[in-house]
Amino acid sequence: MLFGRLTERAQRVLAHAQEEAIRLNHSNIGTEHLLLGLMKEPEGIAAKVLESFNITEDKVIEEVEKLIGHGQDQTGTLHYTPRAKKVIELSMDEARKLHHNFVGTEHILLGLIRENEGVAARVFANLDLNITKARAQVVKALGSPEMSNKNATANKSNNTPTLDGLARDLTVIAKDGTLDPVVGRDKEITRVIEVLSRRTKNNPVLIGEPGVGKTAIAEGLAQAIVNNEVPETLKGKRVMSLDMGTVVAGTKYRGEFEERLKKVMEEIHQAGNVILFIDELHTLVGAGGAEGAIDASNILKPALARGELQCIGATTLDEYRKNIEKDAALERRFQPIQVDEPTVEDTIAILKGLRDRYEAHHRINISDEALEAAAKLSDCYVSDRFLPDKAIDLIDEASSKVRLKSHTTPNNLKEIEQEIEKVKNEKDAAVHAQEFENAANLRDKQTKLEKQYEDAKNEWKTTQGDQSTSLSKEDIGEVIAGWTGIPLTKINETESDRLLNLEQTLHDRVIGQNDAVTSISKAVRRARAGLKDPKRPIGSFIFLGPTGVGKTELARALAESMFGEEDAMIRVDMSEFMEKHAVSRLVGAPPGYVGHDEGGQLTEKVRRKPYSVILFDEIEKAHPDVFNILLQVLDDGHLTDTKGRQVDFRNTVIIMTSNVGAQELQDQRFAGFGGGSEGHDYETIRKTMMKELKNSFRPEFLNRVDDIIVFHKLSKDELKEIVTMMVNKLTQRLSEQDINIVVTDKAKEKIAEEGYDPEYGARPLIRAIQKTVEDNLSELILDGNQIEGKEVVIDHDGDEFKYNINEKNNGISDEGNEVTETEA
């Protein structure tokens, strides 16, 4: 907290506040202790103003002890509560508004008055202090000394009126204490001071990625000037932040912009104590240069070269390269200073420096573990932004979320409010109907409810009081999960059970294939428990096997179990990438080609959904160059698109399916179903497919894959299970049209028999169901049979399929409603 600007009396107030907290055995210094501290300084303006309202020290002590009482024996260091910190911030704000250079007891009192929550506010309410009159009394007691300060400030800057209207004086803002502290940038600030102290071309330009803290360095320089931590050459200088948009705004006629900029330059030259700071320096190039007029950069060049104008610029690497470097004459007038992204450790130090500001704003406590989690998790999971900006935003949003959650009006208050509104409407209706006795009863009921509401509200506020809400590591995880979709919160019991039973969930959709299901499930559990390699994808797999055994279906089932819907899967059909030139569509077209601005089909989807299942279907159909792109994805977990953006694949499950070797198996008569024993068949299939896989793909590609799984052929029993699954899906579809079908076991066996094909796996079952069930049902409907609201029983008598139409839930077949397959 910024206590350097407090008067001696105000500092004594804070010391008294600490003593009062110790006397009352409280573990924190709150607003009530600040109030007691004010009362301990009877000669201060604050105490005198309160005394004029008949508020004495004894009364305040009595109220405080009544409201919160004495605590237990307190140990350790005393800390200010977030609300007390907010009061100090408000008191500084009051001093700035009154143009006072220091914070006194009167400003602390104004801060307490503005902070309308907390124990001090309740003490004022209990002692019937009129807040508006008290504030007016403080301002009156101050008299007019502030006007002299105001005039002094005005006189200091009245020699630069144009500049003052277009720029912000960072040194004045730093003096007011409203700039955030700058942590860990001493090296860069020293380098800026060295360049500014040169005789000519003394213009540093801060170059770095967005969000690394370039503007903060200029603010740090302003704070160093205010604190006299600069060489003699820079003492007394003013750092003015100029926005080129403001300079251009309103210049309707030719020459107005140039005249305005020239006037600013003349004022800076005459004042001799101004350092100009231009954020987004690249906006100089072309600014005000419409219709052949000279732009801002060309107007400033002579003054920049001669050293008449000291300018600090800030811009990103890309903008510097595109706008500044192409103008060699402008580039040589600036000295580049590289501002690198801070490390995670440096970011934690920066967050600790900013903690007080965010605690005071959100009125919560921010723990060290929350700061560390914000730095580490944002570094790990938010790959398209830079530290410390993304970590600061994370702390800010998480603090806001916690604050709002803890201060939401409880349900019982909302219910009483609704009841009051209801009674009020009934009372108005009774008055309108001239039922005055009923209206009087309702009025009494309303009064009773309003009293009940006030009591409940006061009780809720009392429990809230100065109770400190803390920001934890879990809160940070929740917010970053909301940003990215990656689950980072603590695993709860429900999710734990779901992960442990993932195999069973997948088996509900994928029949057989235990090896594949187990391998996938283990990879997902490793990732969710935080044990996976942080630099690689969650898992990468190649699924081999003949067609129709469930390779693609397993990927769909995994997407549904992880995200609740199949559409969450990113599917890339590799048959679309058979030509060499089509490979670029994955990462985006190169510059100069059509579609460069659209991004890649794969990279754009993963950028938007970094936590996903990616299915590369039928990989043997793709051009070999595709697998060169996948090498770095499998090994390093990232891919760079054509715009130079790094796309993070570390939170994806990569599944590749292939039928490689299936043709050779068919030639060997081992594909599909039947043949020798199950074990012998599987080993032959496995050896053949692995051999073909090694012939088709490079070893460096296969070596990067976590697991290569050969799918088993499907047995007849498994086929029957698949038929049951397919029939259930059909039943669900038909139930939406109020048609209920029942397929008997005999019919299912016949469908499985008809759909049995050693070459094509389970896919012929779809055709068999279409032929035996869907086609005949559609003919029944078109033939005039009213089957809506009825039950259709599909059976097989050994020769043909039979369709019995029953009344729903009747259980008795109507003799005249039996239809054979041939009749249908």
From Swiss-Prot:
One matching Pfam family is: AAA
For the region I, what residue ranges are annotated? 163-410
Enumerate the GO terms in the molecular function aspect: ATP binding; ATP hydrolysis activity
Query: Organism's domain of life?
Result: Bacteria
Enumerate the UniProt keywords alphabetically: ATP-binding, Chaperone, Nucleotide-binding, Repeat, Stress response
Classification via CDD domains? AAA, RecA-like_ClpB_Hsp104-like
> To which protein family does this belong?
Belongs to the ClpA/ClpB family. ClpC subfamily.
What this protein is reported to do is described as: Required for growth at high temperatures, probably by acting as a chaperone during heat shock and targeting heat-denatured proteins for degradation by ClpP.
What's the protein name?
ATP-dependent Clp protease ATP-binding subunit ClpC
What organism is listed for this UniProt entry? Staphylococcus haemolyticus (strain JCSC1435)
Phylogenetic classification of the source organism? Bacteria, Bacillati, Bacillota, Bacilli, Bacillales
Q: Which gene encodes it?
A: clpC
